[in-house]
Amino acid sequence: MATRSLFHSLRCRLTNNGVLGSNFIRNAESSRFSKSYNADAAIGNSLVEESEEKDDLKSRIFRLRLPKRSATTVLEKWIGEGNQMTINELREISKELRRTRRYKHALEVTEWMVQHEESKISDADYASRIDLISKVFGIDAAERYFEGLDIDSKTAETYTSLLHAYAASKQTERAEALFKRIIESDSLTFGAITYNEMMTLYMSVGQVEKVPEVIEVLKQKKVSPDIFTYNLWLSSCAATFNIDELRKILEEMRHDASSNEGWVRYIDLTSIYINSSRVTNAESTLPVEAEKSISQREWITYDFLMILHTGLGNKVMIDQIWKSLRNTNQILSSRSYICVLSSYLMLGHLREAEEIIHQWKESKTTEFDASACLRILNAFRDVGLEGIASGFHLILVHNKCSLENEGSS
């Protein structure tokens, strides 16, 4: 189960950092997934340091530090001193607490909001509470809270939040039962994020064959897929070596009305990865390796996480994923080197790309493949990215990589 846990921990970074995991995804185009776990910790430390110089409400709450101390007590004292607070201020404090993993204090702030500002509580506020309850008290408590909401509060956002909680805890049967309720609902409208949660769950538990079923329902419901939807769909095809279907999906993406610069970058990089890695349909006959090791199929799903973040222009997450993969006890595949190398090149980070070349050459377990580098070079040229290809060519020359048969690789 170690490999699936690794995949789940990496995938959760896509979905765990917003109000439901869903608001974060909705806002990802602007935020570019700029907050990683280490960045969140740094934010928390800076807020604590800042709080020692200020005496506003947020500073008092962040000075609590220990989870056993009560944010409710701080709020009551603040009001008792004759101070005021707005619900938007409380939302912002709760958001900051979530970002720094202060879930208990964040939950206490939302509880105050419900008790004192119930008329102003939004669907997103209830969704946030479901997510926080699941983190603080467990999935059963989150489920009870959701079922106890009145009918008007059981919205697309709260349904999706509970589905996210099920997915995060790998509660497949519960998630499937809830998803059935969701797709049978006639009164609520769900977006791509809800379907993405279900596909993320299937990917994390190794049931990749169920991803196309979710896509089929999404299309029946006439829900527009987003780049995360496509990434999950493509990942499932690559993981099962269904490369013909993968190419069809890429073509569909090219003609999607939502296509933008990030999508084009994603499409180009996927094509480069498939061509330079030489992934073929024939590999679907390969046996899956023992559970204790990472199979080729699982490596490919990790690679597609990196491809997604490249499409979003988020170097921080590429760094984070690559570091996580290097820190495992598994032997890195040549495909993984090809993927991270292509990702850095696509975003114009030549210094990092050259560092990957050095790591690959110095690896004691994965032999450096100069011919793969030439395939990357030619693949960038094939999609019309001659400038990137030229920069990579210089890196190869500088590092004395063989360029024999360059035109035919």
Swiss-Prot record:
Compartment(s) where it occurs, according to its Swiss-Prot or TrEMBL record: Mitochondrion
UniProt-recorded Gene Ontology molecular function terms: mRNA binding
Keywords linked to the UniProt accession: Mitochondrion, Repeat, Transit peptide
A GO-annotated cellular component: mitochondrion
Alphabetized InterPro entries for the sequence: Pentatricopeptide_rpt, TPR-like_helical_dom_sf
Presequence range in chain numbering: 1-38
Pfam family, one: PPR
Repeat region (PPR), residues: 155-189, 191-225, 226-256, 262-296, 298-332, 333-367
Predominant cellular place of this UniProt entry's protein: mitochondrion
The protein's name in its UniProt record: Pentatricopeptide repeat-containing protein At5g09450, mitochondrial
Keyword presence, Mitochondrion: yes
Top-level taxon: Eukaryota
Similarity comment text for this entry: Belongs to the PPR family. P subfamily.
